[in-house]
Amino acid sequence: MKKLKSFGGKNLSGKSMNQLQKLQEEMQKKLQEVEEGFSNVEVEVSVGGGAIKILATADRKVKDIEIDEDLLSDGETLKDLLTAGINELMEKIEKIREEEMAKVTQNLLPFGF
């Protein structure tokens, strides 16, 4: 059987290739589980001193938006606060997603990869 060169100049035998394939399949399964779990993770932001609250899940679905009635008469401020709130929410969600995905990959990758 022909050996393939891998990272660091090491040879990969058929057995090693099978192990890598199993590792890849396990990682894909774990990542899918984490992805599905994001629908159960709620993220909330509050902007404008609590005038606007936005609730979403880590799978990027907005569940609720609360707006102080006093803001409804000031369209420009409402727009600015909604924009700021949504941007802050998306940043929080991305941070959560990156951290959870990193946990999976760190736990599954063998030392040296």
From Swiss-Prot:
Q: Which InterPro entries match?
A: YbaB-like_sf, YbaB/EbfC
Q: Which UniProt keywords apply?
A: Cytoplasm, DNA-binding
Provide the primary localization. cytoplasm
Keyword Transmembrane among record annotations: no
One Pfam family per UniProt: YbaB_DNA_bd
The stretch of residues making up the signal peptide is none
Compartments (UniProt record): Cytoplasm, Nucleoid
Q: Name one GO cellular component term.
A: bacterial nucleoid
One of the entry's Gene Ontology molecular-function terms is: DNA binding
The UniProt subunit note reads as follows: Homodimer.
Q: What does this protein do?
A: Binds to DNA and alters its conformation. May be involved in regulation of gene expression, nucleoid organization and DNA protection.
Please give the family membership noted in the entry.
Belongs to the YbaB/EbfC family.
* Protein name, per record: Nucleoid-associated protein THA_1374
Tell me which species this is from. Thermosipho africanus (strain TCF52B)
